[in-house]
Amino acid sequence: LLLQMELNKRQEEKMKDQDFMARAIELAKKGRLKVQPNPMVGCVIVKEKKIIGEGWHKSFGGAHAEINAIKNCKRKFGTKKANKLIEGADLYVNLEPCSIKKNTPPCTNSIIQHGIRKVICGTLDPNPAINGQGIKILKKARVQVKIGILQTECKSLNRVFFTTQQKSRPYIILKSAQ
């Protein structure tokens, strides 16, 4: 009976993880045709199984999804209350948080500074400059990390980006008719 209860708890947790990741994917889709050559990324911040902030990467060169989710939480609750809510929260994002400064500061820094307890990401970033580095930085800062929730859907969403990063060529679709 105890084992069954533990299995039920894990299954329930898995379903919640999938639900929150599905929402992050839906948010990411809002960036379609606006963020290229960057990937489409969505983010949901959750505290006590409730969404307290959400965001997506809205435009090339603009703030990333994680930062927009934090800003969304601050707009909803005010900065002081939001900072308390974000501390110890879980962050769901369809792609590994960036760990390099390019057009924007690394998202890993903001995640750590805000005291986020756990990061659940759908898949690693295929960009060789990031691939796994964001995860290492978060773990070093004692942030729990879980990878692979709805991984197939997360990779499919950004298949153009993945092809460019992994194969150094554009994503090609061939249509043929007779």
Specify the residue positions occupied by each region the protein language model found.
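A short, polar/charged loop-to-alpha-helix boundary motif
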Residues: 58-71
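Short hydrophobic alpha-helix segments
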Residues: 53-55
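A short, small-residue-rich loop immediately preceding and capping a beta-strand
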Residues: 86-95
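Zinc-dependent deaminase
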Residues: 6-35, 48-51, 77-87, 100-178
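Short, small/polar residue-rich loop motifs at catalytic or cofactor-binding pockets
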Residues: 37-40
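Residues that line or immediately flank small-molecule/substrate-binding pockets and catalytic motifs
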Residues: 59, 95, 123
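Short beta-strand segments
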Residues: 42-44, 94, 175-178
